[in-house]
């Protein structure tokens, strides 16, 4: 069984659905701070399966220990955490407390229960701003002044240091950026706030004539001076 933290969020729910489609059993934990039980209902509707779910804050290590003890967890995919660069500048303590404390609590619970397989969803933002072609070997830009980026850098360092203590650890870190799209049944997708900040929800609102235009303030070295972005479909 695979435990998916943040499994009712946009990325986590699609991960859970893909795992079930490939015959894997999943257990979802989520504190519902940025998700809804409606997503759980949709997962069960699409898959036709019962999906075990436990509402907990994974910073609560004793409660997380009980989940590991109750279910036969063999691996963890960590998709929980705060993810807004802009918001983190306004709420730095919340971002450090959530993103750093979550990974520490999760690793403690895994260590205690003997689970040693982890996929951690990090961010391409750990590199900071760079004009170079990115690679896994590139060092982090620790001087970039943003709490979200720093919290992800800290989380990766904690994971690496923990992995060095036991050769049984099998860990992969995925540095994601600009995840978009939705499941083909059109009943599972991104939770969009009333005032979205991501460009795809904004573009869809403009296309649906719910707003007049999208304001692009940044200038770039492109033909029309606007920023070019690459996107990764959530099912990829």
Predicted regions located by residue number:
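Conserved Rossmann-fold NAD(P)-dependent oxidoreductase catalytic core, especially the SDR/UDP-sugar
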Residues: 78, 104-147, 165-167, 172
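Glycine-rich NAD(P)-binding loop of the Rossmann-fold in SDR/ketoreductase-type enzymes
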Residues: 35, 59, 75, 94-105, ...
């Amino acid at each position: 069984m695979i435990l998916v933290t943040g499994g009712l969020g946009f990325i986590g729910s699609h991960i859970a659905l893909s795992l079930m489609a490939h015959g894997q059993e999943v257990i979802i934990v989520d504190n519902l701070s940025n998700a809804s039980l409606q997503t759980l209902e949709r997962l069960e509707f699409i898959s036709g399966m019962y999906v075990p779910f436990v509402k907990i804050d994974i910073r609560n290590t004793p409660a997380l220990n009980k989940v590991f003890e109750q279910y036969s967890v063999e691996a963890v995919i960590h998709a929980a955490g705060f993810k807004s660069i802009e918001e983190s500048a306004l709420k730095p303590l919340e971002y450090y407390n959530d993103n750093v404390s979550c990974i520490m609590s999760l690793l403690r619970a895994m260590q205690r229960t003997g689970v040693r397989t982890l996929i951690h969803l990090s961010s391409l933002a750990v590199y900071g701003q760079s004009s170079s072609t990115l690679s896994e070997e590139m060092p982090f830009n620790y001087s970039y002044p943003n709490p979200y980026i720093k919290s992800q850098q800290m989380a990766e360092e904690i994971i690496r240091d923990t992995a060095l203590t036991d050769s049984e650890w099998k860990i992969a870190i995925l540095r994601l950026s600009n995840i978009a799209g939705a499941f083909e049944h059109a009943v599972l997708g991104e939770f969009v706030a009333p005032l979205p900040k991501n460009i795809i929800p904004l573009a869809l609102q403009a296309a649906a004539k719910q707003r007049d235009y999208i304001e692009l303030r940044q200038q770039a070295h492109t033909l029309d001076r606007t920023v070019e972005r690459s996107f990764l479909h959530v099912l990829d």
